[in-house]
């Protein structure tokens, strides 16, 4: 009957409106979180990093005393020149904690850049592992996958890690798509695990296989070549100067 048709029409319309509203909310929520994450990081960079006038250094100083008053989980600062990778590094007893939390403790799907809970916070381990989300906007470690291109590496062969004690140059050794249980995810990886990464690296490093005394940093983010794929970039730490 006409009444049944009309009722069906309104029921379908209500469902479509519900779907539209939910989708709209999801889109709004996504971009709202992106903007909140970007704004907060810009504020952190503005408030706690110091570039001295007239200095030609590529890197900068970080006011760790003030930054740690905001959050005592801050262990370091990671910086890739000519890139959005310019973030404090946090560490918590639970690796899941900063997957969805910002430095101020607020919930955000962008999360934070964070160090593996197993690592010593002063980079004294053989291999320090640092994680970040692969955001489609390029935030966090979204741009780390640029190292899948050798030409990008040729223009960006090093990063900087600032800590409360020492500033380091991070000379990049290899980048590879790996399984989440790859033996490289160890605070003391074997020489064979490192050699395997170098053999399949997405860029041609200028470095030789490092000796046992070298300290390494592994940067890790999601990749999409297969289920649970990860993309890692490994570098060798070189101390530049004491910061205390």
Feature names for model-found ranges:
Residues 17-244:
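Solvent-exposed, non-transmembrane regions of membrane-associated and secreted proteins
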């Amino acid at each position: 009957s006409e009444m049944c048709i009309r009722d069906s029409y309104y029921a379908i319309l209500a469902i479509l409106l519900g779907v539209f509203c939910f989708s709209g909310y999801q889109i709004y929520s996504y971009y709202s979180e992106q903007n909140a994450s970007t704004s907060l990081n810009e504020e952190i960079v503005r408030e706690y990093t110091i570039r001295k006038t007239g200095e030609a250094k590529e890197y900068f100083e970080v006011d760790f005393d003030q930054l740690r008053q905001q959050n005592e989980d801050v262990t370091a600062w990671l910086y890739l020149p000519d890139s959005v990778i310019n973030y404090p590094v946090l560490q918590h007893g639970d690796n899941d904690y900063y997957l969805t939390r910002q430095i101020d403790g607020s919930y955000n799907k962008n999360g934070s850049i964070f160090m593996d809970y197993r690592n010593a916070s002063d980079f004294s381990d053989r291999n320090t592992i640092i994680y970040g989300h692969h955001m489609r906007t390029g935030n966090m470690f979204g741009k780390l996958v640029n190292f899948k291109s050798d030409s990008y590496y040729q223009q960006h062969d090093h990063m900087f890690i600032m800590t409360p004690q020492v500033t380091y140059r991070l000379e990049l050794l290899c980048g590879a798509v790996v399984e989440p249980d790859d033996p490289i995810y160890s605070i003391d990886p074997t020489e064979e695990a490192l050699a395997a990464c170098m053999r399949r690296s997405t860029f041609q490093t200028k470095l030789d296989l490092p000796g046992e005394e070298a300290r390494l940093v592994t940067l890790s983010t999601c990749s999409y070549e297969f289920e649970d794929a990860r993309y890692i970039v490994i570098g060798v730490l070189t101390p530049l100067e004491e910061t205390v």
